[in-house]
């Protein structure tokens, strides 16, 4: 048996500028607008110039990536919960 140190997830220091959020969901009209609207509720300083939208290779999915200033864990959890509640989001990274 080998001794391995406890592995802990990296700690984020808040506020964290340029924190990336990537949202993957079904491609469809208004998906990126919906993602931006939800994230702006929790991060009003969202710079839409950082918005990157990509289609999947077969066009079934869309990924939307933005950069925010993350203020705390509660903010990130609220963004995640609201995005998942839409029913259109498959994954939030």
From Swiss-Prot:
<dbReference type="InterPro" id="IPR027471">
    <property type="entry name" value="YbeD-like_sf"/>
</dbReference>
<protein>
    <recommendedName>
        <fullName>UPF0250 protein PA3998</fullName>
    </recommendedName>
</protein>
<dbReference type="GO" id="GO:0005829">
    <property type="term" value="C:cytosol"/>
</dbReference>
<comment type="similarity">
    <text>Belongs to the UPF0250 family.</text>
</comment>
<dbReference type="InterPro" id="IPR007454">
    <property type="entry name" value="UPF0250_YbeD-like"/>
</dbReference>
<dbReference type="Pfam" id="PF04359">
    <property type="entry name" value="DUF493"/>
</dbReference>
